[in-house]
Amino acid sequence: MTQFSRRSALLTGLALPGIVEAVCHVGASEDDDAKPKRFEELAGFEAAEVASKYPVAILPLGSLEFHGPHNPLGSDSIIVSGIAERVATRTKGLLMPPITFTQCPAHTAHFAGTVSVRPEVMTMYFADVLRNILRLGFRRVFILNGHDGNIGPGRGAIAEVADETKDAALLFASWWEFLSTETMRSLGMFQQANGGHGHGGPLETSAVAAFRPDLIHLDKAKDLPEPPDLSNGAPYFLQKASAKDWPGYSGYVSEASAEKGRKLVKISEDLIVKLVESWLSHGEAPGSW
């Protein structure tokens, strides 16, 4: 009976009490209970009741985008999916599949490997995804973002869908914004004045390494000098049609490590969980109106 499968037991009519249950648990991980429920793994009969079982749906937004020769194309998706899984576990939310094909800016779109969706298409597509999640009965959806290019289309879609509903709330946050420049400087992990921020830079590379160190190839990239800060601290938005001679990443990437990434991801994760729990408990996010 050691090789007796559940299917064999059922087909031969030998599904005796305890046999099927024991077979079903063969190979199950002890950590299974610590993992969140994933929407795509639900059976069809479960779908109609998910909103009554989970306080929030958690939707990760990633990208497929060139992040330098040393990083995987799915860097944003890898990071945000990893953090979203932990947040879903801790908040008992239902984890939705990540949205990977998203809008990428012009200065990365020309690199091989980047797959970009037009902003207006991204907005319409994302809005439809949100509508369908709400149609399941969820009144709270937390969108965890891993890609700067998603912010504009994301906010547009959220505003559109929120205007259509009477009692739903949609919360949007980007994981790296919980690691401010001031926080990064205080940690002293990276020598850059901006604390390691930047596309494909040491902060982002470290975060990827926290989840998939096997996908990092630091030997393929060289350190790049930090561009001068001409803003004097003023907030602004600059979009270039192309970045001439830019190699598709930034910063002193040799300073990246999985150990640093794990610490940074944990800081971001803890603050995100605090935000979501406060929102679920009080109906408002800190600082919102």
Locations of regions flagged by a protein language model:
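Extended, histidine- and acidic-residue-enriched regions that form the cofactor-binding/catalytic faces
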Residues: F4, L10-F142, G146-W289
